[in-house]
């Protein structure tokens, strides 16, 4: 569960506080260099923000769905009670406890 709570720290955006003038100078140099090259305009939409708000919920739903599928897979993989396959698979149980549900119909 710790990995789920850690995702918020990795996926959230960070706000940079006002730093030293040297960092500001570097940004200015990078911005000036970018003006010389062709820069494509990028449009940000509100859809990204909505997706970020539901990230944890979607992750929990995915985990729950995976758990349900794994339990359903185990349930369907079990042999029917009282069948020859069940008696063969659970032979030690059927010998020690002949009245066990898996050994009888």
UniProtKB/Swiss-Prot annotation:
It comes from the Eukaryota. Residues 1-77 form a transit peptide. The maturation of the PSII-T precursor to its final form occurs through a two step process. First, a stromal intermediate is formed, which, upon translocation into the thylakoid membrane, is processed to the mature protein. It is found in: Plastid, Chloroplast thylakoid membrane. One of its GO terms (biological process) is photosynthesis. The keyword Plastid applies. The keyword Thylakoid applies. Its main location: plastid. One of its GO terms (cellular component) is chloroplast thylakoid membrane. May be a component of the oxygen-evolving complex. This is Photosystem II 5 kDa protein, chloroplastic. It comes from Gossypium hirsutum.
